[in-house]
Amino acid sequence: DKHVKAWNEISKILRGKEITLEELHTKLNGTPNIQNILYFTDGKATKEELEKYSQKKEEYYRQFCKEDTEKFHLVDGVCEFFDHLKEKDIPFTIASASIKENIDFFIESFGLDRWIKPEDIVYDDGTYENKIAMFHKAADVIGIDMKDIRIYEDSNSGIRNAYDAGCEQIVVICDKENEEEFLKRPGVIEVMQDFSFAKEL
């Protein structure tokens, strides 16, 4: 995962060692950059350092994406799924722990503005306390009550935050061998590997 590789680089710079698998799953996945940098520095990073290393992490991430031409693409079936939602007038948006530079990069790379107005995408602009607040903002953007929203997630912390935000319909994108484990999680109603089902809609 390119985010992991990027955080590894930042971890090596800030504390001279790579991140552990446990840290990745319990502390870093799906959390805002600033929170992760504070974790690496035991809360000692200055405002300037938070900004600097947040930007640097995303520079690493975009660099790794560009280098991996084979795997840098949307999940199978996502385009058809977005087309279906638009066709049926079902409101949707993206809530991402990425910063604006990354969102701009994704919009440009994948043409996301075909389906979603860029200003409707919720991202880490430094004003959100956590991903829960971002989910609430996304619900406001599409004008739907959280209990009626379906959230698609692929990270442990994202699943937990979606549930804590009040979502009762969480769909997890995961490897086949992890399906059983994720189905036991609160709020999870479905698991899948991709959106290929949308090609039949």
What are these model-predicted stretches?
Residues 1-79, 84-88:
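N-terminal helical cap/lid subdomain that shapes the substrate entry/recognition surface
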Residues 83, 100, 105-201:
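Asp-based, Mg2+/Mn2+-dependent phosphohydrolase catalytic module
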